[in-house]
Amino acid sequence: MKLRDKWKIYLGLTTIKVQCPCFFLFHNDENRTTTSNLDSVKSKKKRRKTISDASIVSNGSLVSHPSIDKGKLSILKRYKMSHRLTAIDKLRPLTVLVAWKQLNIAMRPIFPQHRYTEQDKKNWKKKVIIEDLNFLVLRCICACEAISDFEELLGNMRIGLIIDISLLGMNSNESSFLHYLVEVWSIFYLEILPYIEATFLPVTFAKFEIAQLFEEPMKTYWLKKSANIDLKLFSIWVFRKFVVMPKLKKTNRFIEIPQLNTQQQILLVQMISIISLIKPQDESEDLLMNWLNELTLKFLYV
């Protein structure tokens, strides 16, 4: 064999059978056919598209990034898991309850009622990392062993959002109900809602590439089934049902209209226009919404 051919074999530029004993340094089987480096790279890329549940739990988190060319979600990338989560998993096995508790604790800084100190109020965004929250949501899905576990997980998610959103105004010092609604709405819509949508991205946008992360067909089916969940619409409904309506029921109909600046007026109109998109569940809610609309119209045209 010529020296040039030997170099081609070493660089992987040809495909022939090699009988040389030194070939064992590169392959275990002397009769195995060598392949090009380009083909091996392609095969590795194909294998990375599907990641098992075990690798998600043990190796790291996954997060989606927008593609520059097509503007869609690109293939999800893995992130290294924090030492804190690794230590917890070593102490006790991962279950749906344990995974949900970890996610619930990690989401607390998003809501103002869980920011106890001045430092928490100023630096709460530094404690909230969307990639870690996405990873914790995937851990919850990995811990599910049946469709009943997955449905229970979705139920816990709804209950948790209802509790946290309904307590948004507990620290408000505004005496006027319109000032109160404007203040709470600005916090909810501008700060909290984007984080809620980004956190539960693996559940709400499974139709893109999230479902490909699971090798088990059933878990892929669960995620595709949950793709109809509109967490933004659900969160807005919770805000209207448990924040706006209780405040309106306690307000005197003949109350004097307070003064609002331009920014507050914009927020008030925005809130009413958005929460009015959801159909009232009963007649009392319909009456309260009509009264709020009339009051706002009078206020704007005074």
UniProtKB/Swiss-Prot annotation:
Could you tell me the superkingdom of the organism this chain comes from? Eukaryota
Gene Ontology cellular-component terms listed: cytosol; nucleus; TORC2 complex
What name does this protein carry?
Uncharacterized protein C6B12.03c
In Gene Ontology terms, what is a biological process of this protein? TORC2 signaling
The record's annotation in InterPro entries points to: Bit61/PRR5
Coiled coil regions, renumbered to chain = none
